[in-house]
Curated annotation (Swiss-Prot):
Coiled coil: none
Entries under Pfam families matching the protein: ubiquitin (PF00240)
Organism: Sus scrofa (Pig)
CDD domains, A to Z: Ubl_FUBI
InterPro entries registered for this protein in UniProt: FUBI, Ubiquitin-like_dom, Ubiquitin-like_domsf, Ubiquitin_CS, Ubiquitin_dom
Family from the record: Belongs to the ubiquitin family.
Protein name listed in UniProt: Ubiquitin-like protein FUBI
Domain of life, per lineage: Eukaryota
């Protein structure tokens, strides 16, 4: 299935739904140079856990995930 990932740019990924959020972060890191530990992946504004698979998170075909950078400070 296709998945859209919006970071600094919009990327289209081909996934099975069995990938973990951590694997998506690693892929975004290779595309955009943002370290995985500095990324927050959001589905409809809700942060996703690294260990969860896309299927467990409710990600369906043609879903758009947002990738935000962690903010320093508080």
């Amino acid at each position: 299935m296709q998945l859209f990932v919006r970071a600094q740019e919009l990327h289209t990924l081909e996934v099975t739904g069995q990938e973990t959020v951590a694997q998506i972060k690693a892929h975004v890191a290779s595309l955009e140079g943002i370290a995985p530990e500095d990324q927050v992946v959001l589905l409809a504004g809700t942060p996703l856990e690294d260990e969860a698979t896309l299927g467990q998170c409710g990600v369906e075909a043609l879903t758009t995930l947002e990738v935000a950078g962690r903010m320093l400070g508080g």
